[in-house]
């Protein structure tokens, strides 16, 4: 049986019933795969050297897990760390050269007063014996995972030249119950699945979460009014605003890069078309006008155009139209089903759900060298909803395994996949948030 169009099914709320699952638990993380060509790095355990109570967060373990799941690094297993220096002056570089390590990270955790901790760490090039980073960060106990992610970001950027995206958040939807007793929740968590936070609970479907560029708000679709409606919700305060509840479909909201506009799919004129709403005035501009179904808009990074899914050519493909309207150009030509586009920060890569027969996988079109080249990122048969990390190093997507929904984060070179799954639940509709700013 052919899979129904994911993007049309979502807009019309034709959701498959789920088994009874709990939605209050955090996500369980499993890292799948690895690569022999990943850069070897040792993150030495960082002991607590204070006089009080040690933080519950194992800083070095979080940093190691971040680097491992990026696909760019291969950390040395703890059992093979034969020496445990905490300062650069204690590092015996020949030991780590013998272990064929390219880099080593050492550090320690100390008291900073008033219940806070200070983490000092250093990154070294093993071959050269050269210190590349020497930094200190201070945080309270409940922010030690944030500090660990920021450390991993700094290490990642120093070695690769690309800004790290570990200290970011993801949004997703969980579901529980069955039939008429379904319950949904819109959740936000750290990029590795920790620290889940419930944003919205509903007895009706929740779909298509989309982050504002400052990471402070989420746009999403709710059916609580009986019909699809689009809301904006402030994550910190919980305040929300109904911005679209026209007759028919109100779906697939997407914030513009400047946060002032919202692209959306509306059928207010009878057929699903792409519109742009000015969030200040609430004025609508219709961008497409075609007998085909146009949906799933997503902005180009420069804000000058919008990608969207359309079946105007007979089958779902990705098209692009100027943000001011006009004629649309087809973007994808490989395969007879390409939908749900996510565009990298530089506009050079487009991730899609690509279908062939009854198999749907995440594929990526790379235009870095001019002519498009394609790669398959996921091995599943029912994979959908790709979402790039803000640095495009990883792609988050939804999959189904054993009749339940799970999430995967895959490195952009497909070397490593990280599975995020509710211990007793179903999860879907992922969206990777923007970079965070330290306050």
Swiss-Prot record:
Sequence similarity: Belongs to the TolB family.
A Pfam cross-reference name: TolB_N
UniProt keyword Cell division present: yes
Assembly and interaction partners: The Tol-Pal system is composed of five core proteins: the inner membrane proteins TolA, TolQ and TolR, the periplasmic protein TolB and the outer membrane protein Pal. They form a network linking the inner and outer membranes and the peptidoglycan layer.
Subcellular compartments: Periplasm
Gene: tolB
Entry protein name: Tol-Pal system protein TolB
InterPro entries: 6-blade_b-propeller_TolB-like, PD40, Tol-Pal_TolB, TolB_N
């Amino acid at each position: 049986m052919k899979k129904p169009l994911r993007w049309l099914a979502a807009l019309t709320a034709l959701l498959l019933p789920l088994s009874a699952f709990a939605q209050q638990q955090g996500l369980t993380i499993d890292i799948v795969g690895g690569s022999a060509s990943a850069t070897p790095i040792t993150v030495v355990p960082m002991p607590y050297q204070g006089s009080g109570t040690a933080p519950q967060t194992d800083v070095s373990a979080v940093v190691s897990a971040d680097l491992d799941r990026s696909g760019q690094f291969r950390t040395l297993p703890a059992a093979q760390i034969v020496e445990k220096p905490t300062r650069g002056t204690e590092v015996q570089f020949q030991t780590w050269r013998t272990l064929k390590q390219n880099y080593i990270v050492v550090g320690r955790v100390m008291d900073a007063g008033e219940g806070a901790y200070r983490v000092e760490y250093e990154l070294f090039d093993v071959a050269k014996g050269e210190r590349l980073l020497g930094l200190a960060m201070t945080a309270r106990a409940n922010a030690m995972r944030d500090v660990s992610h920021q450390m991993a970001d700094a290490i990642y950027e120093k070695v690769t030249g690309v800004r790290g995206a570990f200290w970011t958040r993801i949004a997703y939807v969980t579901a529980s119950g069955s039939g008429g007793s379904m319950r949904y929740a819109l959740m936000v968590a750290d990029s590795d699945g920790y620290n889940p936070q419930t944003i919205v609970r509903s007895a009706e479907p929740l779909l298509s979460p989309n982050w504002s560029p400052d990471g402070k708000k989420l746009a999403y679709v709710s059916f609580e009014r009986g019909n699809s409606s689009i809301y904006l919700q402030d994550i910190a305060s919980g305040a929300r605003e109904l911005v679209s509840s026209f007759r028919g479909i109100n779906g697939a909201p997407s914030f513009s890069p400047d946060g002032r506009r919202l692209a959306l799919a509306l059928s207010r004129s009878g057929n699903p078309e792409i519109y742009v709403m000015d969030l200040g005035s609430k004025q609508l501009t219709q961008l497409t006008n075609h007998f085909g179904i146009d949906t799933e808009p997503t902005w180009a990074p420069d804000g000058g155009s919008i990608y969207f899914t359309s079946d105007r050519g007979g089958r779902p493909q990705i098209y692009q139209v100027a943000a001011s309207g006009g004629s649309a150009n087809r973007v994808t030509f490989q395969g007879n089903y390409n939908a749900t586009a996510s565009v990298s920060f530089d506009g050079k890569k487009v991730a899609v759900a690509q279908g062939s027969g009854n198999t749907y996988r995440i594929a990526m079109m790379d235009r870095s060298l001019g002519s498009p080249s394609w790669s398959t990122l996921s091995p599943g048969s029912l994979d959908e909803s790709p979402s790039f990390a803000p640095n495009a190093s990883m792609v988050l997507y939804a999959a189904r395994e054993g009749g339940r929904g799970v999430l995967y984060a895959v490195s952009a070179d497909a070397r490593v996949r990280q599975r995020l799954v509710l211990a007793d639940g179903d999860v879907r509709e992922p969206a990777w948030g923007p970079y965070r700013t330290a306050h």
